[in-house]
C-alpha cells in the first residue's frame, strides 16, 4: 500500500505570525521572545509580518490569542510565558488553565498555536530553557501554518473532484 507523505516545511516566507508574550517573569519572557523572533527571521518570516502583543500574565494569553484569531490576519500564533512553581496551588492552576485555554482557542479557530509557556520549578530552569523553547516555538508555528495550509488545500481539491464528477 502506498502512503502519501507531507514533509516538514519550515519556509516562513509570506506567513503572518502573531505572538502573545506575558509580562510576568519578564526577564525570562524577554529571552523567549528574542529567541522566537530571531528564529522566525531565519525561517523567512519578515519583521513586518510579525505582531507582538503583551499581556499581564499566562492566564491572559488565551484571550489575546482568541482576539488575534478572530481578526483572521494570522497564519499561526505563539504563546510565550513562564510559570515558576511557588509554595501554593497557584502554579498548577495557572499552568493547567493557560494550557487548556491555548489548546481550546487553536482548535476553535483552526489556527496553529505554539505553546511556549514554560512551567518550571526555579528561575534558573526557566532561563536555561528560554533559547531552545523560543526557537522551537517559531519552528512549530511555521511548520504547522504550512501543514494546515496544505491540508486545507486538499479539501479544495476534493471540492473540485466532486464538481468534475457532475
Swiss-Prot record:
InterPro entries per UniProt: LS (IPR034964), LS/RS (IPR002180), LS/RS_sf (IPR036467)
Active site: 90 (proton donor)
A GO BP annotation: riboflavin biosynthetic process
Keywords from the UniProt entry: Riboflavin biosynthesis, Transferase
Designated name of the protein: 6,7-dimethyl-8-ribityllumazine synthase
Organism: Cupriavidus necator (strain ATCC 17699 / DSM 428 / KCTC 22496 / NCIMB 10442 / H16 / Stanier 337)
Entries under NCBIfam families matching the protein: lumazine-synth (TIGR00114)
Name of the coding gene: ribH
The protein's annotated pathway: Cofactor biosynthesis; riboflavin biosynthesis; riboflavin from 2-hydroxy-3-oxobutyl phosphate and 5-amino-6-(D-ribitylamino)uracil: step 1/2
EC number: 2.5.1.78
Gene Ontology, cellular component aspect: cytosol; riboflavin synthase complex
Catalytic activity: (2S)-2-hydroxy-3-oxobutyl phosphate + 5-amino-6-(D-ribitylamino)uracil = 6,7-dimethyl-8-(1-D-ribityl)lumazine + phosphate + 2 H2O + H(+)
HAMAP family named in the record: Lumazine_synth (MF_00178)
Pfam families noted in UniProt: DMRL_synthase
UniProt family annotation: Belongs to the DMRL synthase family.
Task performed by this protein: Catalyzes the formation of 6,7-dimethyl-8-ribityllumazine by condensation of 5-amino-6-(D-ribitylamino)uracil with 3,4-dihydroxy-2-butanone 4-phosphate. This is the penultimate step in the biosynthesis of riboflavin.
EC class: transferase
Residues where 5-amino-6-(D-ribitylamino)uracil binds: 24, 58-60, 82-84, 115
Residues given in the record as (2S)-2-hydroxy-3-oxobutyl phosphate binding sites: 87-88, 129
Amino acid at each position: 500500500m502506498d502512503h502519501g507523505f507531507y514533509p516538514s516545511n519550515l519556509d516562513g516566507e509570506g506567513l503572518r505570525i502573531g505572538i502573545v508574550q506575558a509580562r510576568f517573569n519578564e526577564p525570562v519572557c524577554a529571552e523567549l521572545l528574542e529567541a522566537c523572533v530571531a528564529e522566525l527571521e531565519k525561517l523567512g518570516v519578515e519583521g513586518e509580518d510579525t505582531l507582538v502583543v503583551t499581556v499581564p500574565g499566562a492566564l491572559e494569553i488565551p484571550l489575546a490569542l482568541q482576539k488575534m484569531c478572530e481578526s483572521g490576519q494570522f497564519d499561526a500564533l505563539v504563546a510565550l510565558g513562564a510559570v515558576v512553581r511557588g509554595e501554593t496551588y497557584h502554579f498548577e492552576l495557572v499552568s493547567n488553565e493557560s494550557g487548556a485555554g491555548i489548546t481550546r482557542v487553536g482548535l476553535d479557530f483552526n489556527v496553529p498555536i505554539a505553546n511556549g509557556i514554560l512551567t518550571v520549578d526555579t528561575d534558573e530552569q526557566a532561563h536555561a530553557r528560554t533559547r531552545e523553547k523560543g526557537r522551537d516555538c517559531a519552528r512549530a508555528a511555521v511548520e504547522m501554518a504550512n501543514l494546515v495550509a496544505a491540508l486545507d488545500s486538499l479539501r479544495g481539491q476534493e471540492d473540485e473532484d466532486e464538481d468534475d464528477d457532475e
